[in-house]
A protein has these predicted regions:
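Structured beta-strand-rich core segments of catalytic domains in phosphoester-bond hydrolases
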Residues: 1-79
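Structural recognition of the beta-strand scaffold that forms the well-ordered cores
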Residues: 22-25, 33, 70, 81-84, ...
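Short loop/turn segments at secondary-structure transitions that flank enzyme active sites
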Residues: 28-30, 88-91
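A short secondary-structure junction signal
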Residues: 33-37, 83, 92-97
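Short amphipathic alpha-helical segments, especially helix-boundary/capping motifs
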Residues: 46-47, 84-87, 124
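Metal-dependent phosphoesterases centered on the DNase I-like endonuclease/exonuclease/phosphatase
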Residues: 91-179
Length: 179
């Protein structure tokens, strides 16, 4: 990063909390059972996708741009686990593709979590909600992680659709899915 500029921290931002995330719920949040992986180091990921050359501060770099939260909800007496995140944009770096690699691992975190790598997986229904900053078909970024997550049999993609869409030249995916 550059001292005194937005790139000088664990995530891009001029001040603490810029680009953060929040959960607003009409259902009861079981905060006693919530888990926050925002402080988890990128190095603690199974097989992190590091750039080929070591990065300055690599040993203290957090995985999450904003956070990876496991938030149990009580929905009319039934448990629902909300898994929330906001991944880094996989662009705006150099040929080392640090942002693309970090975005890849931020998304792949959920697959490892479902496999039990970080101390348990949800026992009942769950929702993964947030901003992956990555399209599984179009745009820049490493598509493998989002494709693996969406292809996991434990995950159902509701594929929300928009009716009024414009297509862009070179767009391969269904533009109605770009909500």
């Amino acid at each position: 990063g550059r001292l005194g500029e937005p790139e000088d921290a664990h995530s891009y931002g001029w001040y603490a909390g810029e680009g953060g995330q929040a959960i607003l719920s009409r259902f009861a949040i079981r905060d006693d059972a919530a888990r926050d992986f925002a402080q988890m180091l990128w190095a603690d990921m199974p097989s992190p996708l590091w750039p080929s050359e070591p990065m300055p501060g690599q040993e203290v770099q957090r995985l999450s741009r904003a956070g990876h939260w496991i938030v149990p909800l009580d929905v009319r007496g039934a448990p629902l686990t909300l898994m929330s995140f906001h991944a880094t944009t996989p662009v705006f770096d150099g040929p080392e593709d640090r942002n693309g690699r970090r975005n890849h691992d931020e998304i792949l975190f959920w697959r490892y979590y479902l496999d039990g790598a970080f101390g348990g997986a949800p026992k009942g229904p769950f929702v993964i909600a947030g901003n992956a900053n990555l399209d599984p078909v179009d745009g820049e970024g490493r598509k493998t992680a989002i494709q693996v997550l969406l292809g996991d049999t434990r995950v159902q993609d509701p594929k929300p659709r928009s009716e009024r869409v414009e297509t862009t030249p070179g767009h391969k995916g269904d533009p109605k899915l770009d909500t």
